[in-house]
């Protein structure tokens, strides 16, 4: 069964829940609720990546993360940190988090030595932007898929050459604005992600929760995307996704239980 990453955004401006969990105690409380709801891993993000985001500095990002990581580690909870800054990734290595989730796919070689010496798994995400937050750009679905496969090939090779054990790498094809503003690109990648698993023989994470392409197809705003999110997540589960990253852990966990019971 797919493992669930429960999202906790310790931010002011994340696209779906910015500001709700900026307070440390609220972030910890929410994380504990997500674990009760069925999350296998808590994915902490302290700097938003939405197209209209305001940049958060390294010091502030670490300040937001540190007490939450400490509290969750004390309870033995598996932790992922969603960050693309090498300095924050170094902090995460020191804190011995279980996963580092990089929306830019680890583009900075200066962090590779530290990554190689660590034990955490690395979520290597693809985006058409390569560097920076998601942007609203038009994309061609087939061209994006071809480019994505080449990107994964090159980045996996670079990490392995630097000493990162290949089996520690998890691939995330990106969704929503990370694939551009054309919803058909996300649909095509969602349909074809098993090709990524087959080509690289690595685990894949799918993160469709509340993403823009779902809203474009259904006409729903961010807070009304539970049904389309769950439909896409269950599709990914049936197609063999190893990890599902979601805001709505309880709904996904319950749906997975029913699907398993039905066989």
UniProtKB/Swiss-Prot annotation:
| Catalytic activity of the protein | (7,8-dihydropterin-6-yl)methyl diphosphate + 4-aminobenzoate = 7,8-dihydropteroate + diphosphate
Q: Which family does the record assign?
A: Belongs to the DHPS family.
In the record, the effect of residue 179 to K is given as: Fully complements folP deletion mutation in E.coli strain BW25113. Does not adversely impact growth or enzyme expression levels
Protein purpose: Catalyzes the condensation of para-aminobenzoate (pABA) with 6-hydroxymethyl-7,8-dihydropterin diphosphate (DHPt-PP) to form 7,8-dihydropteroate (H2Pte), the immediate precursor of folate derivatives. Confers resistance to sulfonamide antibiotics, including sulfamethoxazole (SMX), sulfadiazine and sulfisoxazole.
Q: Reported effect of changing residue 179 to E? A: Drastically reduces ability to complement folP deletion mutation in E.coli strain BW25113. Does not adversely impact growth or enzyme expression levels
Q: Which residues form the Pterin-binding domain?
A: 2-257
Q: What is its EC number?
A: 2.5.1.15
Q: What else is known?
A: The sul3 gene is located on various large self-transmissible resistance plasmids and on transposons.
Give the pathway listed in the UniProt entry for this protein: Cofactor biosynthesis; tetrahydrofolate biosynthesis; 7,8-dihydrofolate from 2-amino-4-hydroxy-6-hydroxymethyl-7,8-dihydropteridine diphosphate and 4-aminobenzoate: step 1/2
This protein's source sits in the domain of life called Bacteria
- Please tell me where (7,8-dihydropterin-6-yl)methyl diphosphate binds in this chain: 82, 101, 172, 211, 245-247
Query: What organism is recorded for this protein?
Result: Escherichia coli
UniProt-annotated binding residues for Mg(2+): 9
Residues binding 6-hydroxymethyl-7,8-dihydropterin are: 101, 172, 211
Question: What are the entry keywords?
Answer: Antibiotic resistance, Folate biosynthesis, Magnesium, Metal-binding, Plasmid, Transferase
Cofactor names from the entry are: Mg(2+)
According to UniProt, the name of this protein is Dihydropteroate synthase type-3
Q: Where does 4-aminobenzoate bind?
A: 49, 177, 212
Effect in UniProt of substituting residue 177 to G: Similar catalytic efficiency for para-aminobenzoate (pABA) as substrate as wild-type. Significantly increases competitive inhibition by sulfamethoxazole (SMX) versus pABA
